[in-house]
Amino acid sequence: MAVSASRVQQAEELLQRPAERQLMRSQLAAAARSINWSYALFWSISDTQPGVLTWTDGFYNGEVKTRKISNSVELTSDQLVMQRSDQLRELYEALLSGEGDRRAAPARPAGSLSPEDLGDTEWYYVVSMTYAFRPGQGLPGRSFASDEHVWLCNAHLAGSKAFPRALLAKSASIQSILCIPVMGGVLELGTTDTVPEAPDLVSRATAAFWEPQCPTYSEEPSSSPSGRANETGEAAADDGTFAFEELDHNNGMDIEAMTAAGGHGQEEELRLREAEALSDDASLEHITKEIEEFYSLCDEMDLQALPLPLEDGWTVDASNFEVPCSSPQPAPPPVDRATANVAADASRAPVYGSRATSFMAWTRSSQQSSCSDDAAPAVVPAIEEPQRLLKKVVAGGGAWESCGGATGAAQEMSATKNHVMSERKRREKLNEMFLVLKSLLPSIHRVNKASILAETIAYLKELQRRVQELESSREPASRPSETTTRLITRPSRGNNESVRKEVCAGSKRKSPELGRDDVERPPVLTMDAGSSNVTVTVSDKDVLLEVQCRWEELLMTRVFDAIKSLHLDVLSVQASAPDGFMGLKIRAQFAGSGAVVPWMISEALRKAIGKR
């Protein structure tokens, strides 16, 4: 949709005079507070980048994390809210000047805000000042191009293309955003509450912009009567006419009244008033001089902004947008001193809509914008450099610190390296402990930490359950009966294979039955180590180990070490220790594809229980 030149010119003229800028801030405050939303921003066409919407002014009405006020000034609640917006704007300007030249940045007052004083919503408000939009891009661009309001609910869930600040909105808990085209620009309102679209809210938010504004007068005089009389007298002398000030007549009447009343008290009061008037004039001149020096210093600073960052490669067709051309104006007629001071202040004031982002390097630009009937397309280059200042501030490095902090930077770098090394050592130690824990588990193949912890918990619960079962079923048992070892020979695959079978003393099995059972049962190997018995039964990959010996300290540790050395995974363990004898029944399984012969298993167990 084509943007008329009258809309752009209206926005530019609105922000040229200080009184109009103050009126704009009051209207933004009224818009945000009328519907009780968190902030209000005004976007307008930049004069340095035609066809680009940039941040112009704003009002913050959200939560405040840290408030800094001067003890010498008492402010009302409304003044505190307005002061917060000014403090956020000053912080943005401090970041802006600190990125370009720290030495040239003016000293900041003690009550100024620092990045650590801001909450999430305040950070969203400040960072929004660095964004720029082409018509049709983002919420402000869409509202500007269509000349209709745009309402967005659940802003934290929106996509980055529709809402480039979605990530910032999520961190700041911004839920609803409303953009309304007003006065040649776009009014953006946001809140942390989810508010459904309602036409009456749009009307209430824009009511302050359409109401007729009357000039407001301050109850406190901005300058002394004598100062105004002097200025008026000088202006009259320049014009060649004579003018009489009512204030002079009033002062004369006051003097006559006090003189007629008589008394030294009235004369003393008169002298005090005259001295105060003179001191007010001197202080006003001093302040004016300081302001002039400050603006002259700003003019000398080599600070010229790059184009603001745009989120994608969207280009502007100049044929759809009309930019007003500046034509030479005739020389203005001579004006009085007061009017000249106001015009000088307006010329020195920063131009809204041309603020530079604080997240890119400063360079000198020799390009000058020109206007013609056939304007060339306004191409805004995308900024490749990341937003370094924001990362620096979030990381804890203020942009306005002194330049002589080389030693502090080196110490900070050393502390960072030490922290990284200590964190690496801690992780290595933790990994070693997990490996030790994994080696104590009977059977686990996954090596991630979550699996190791889960298997450990399950294994401990299983052991606890078995201990309870053993304690409940424990009964006095006599010493195991002595067993005899008999060598039984049987044919196996054409070769004679000798295995040892355990035969209990009280067995009723007959010898013919032994031959038949040997064909069906897996091989069993039993060896006697003094008063100790070891039985090994192997079936495919399953292994049954039975150990009976006298109880000793660290006996089970040696047995499990021997089992581990044979690459066996323990499936279950049953243990009993009646009358000083230990009975172990262990079910295990070969961990790999290979198998170990029974006599090697028995020999390893015999050595384990035979150690003293």
Swiss-Prot record:
A Pfam family it matches = HLH
The protein's assembly and partners: Efficient DNA binding requires dimerization with another bHLH protein.
Protein name (Swiss-Prot/TrEMBL): Anthocyanin regulatory R-S protein
Query: Where does the record place a coiled coil?
Result: none
Query: What is its subcellular localisation?
Result: Nucleus
Does the keyword Transcription regulation belong to this entry? yes
Organism domain of life? Eukaryota
Keyword list (alphabetical) reads: Activator, DNA-binding, Nucleus, Transcription, Transcription regulation
Give the source lineage, highest ranks first: Eukaryota, Viridiplantae, Streptophyta, Embryophyta, Tracheophyta
SMART domains, from UniProt?
HLH
- Encoded by which gene? R-S
Look up keyword Nucleus and say if it applies: yes
Which GO molecular function annotation, any one, does this entry have?
DNA binding
bHLH domain ranges (all copies): 414-463
Query: What organism does this protein naturally occur in?
Result: Zea mays
Q: Which InterPro entries match?
A: bHLH-TF_ACT-like_plant, bHLH_dom, HLH_DNA-bd_sf, MYC/MYB_N
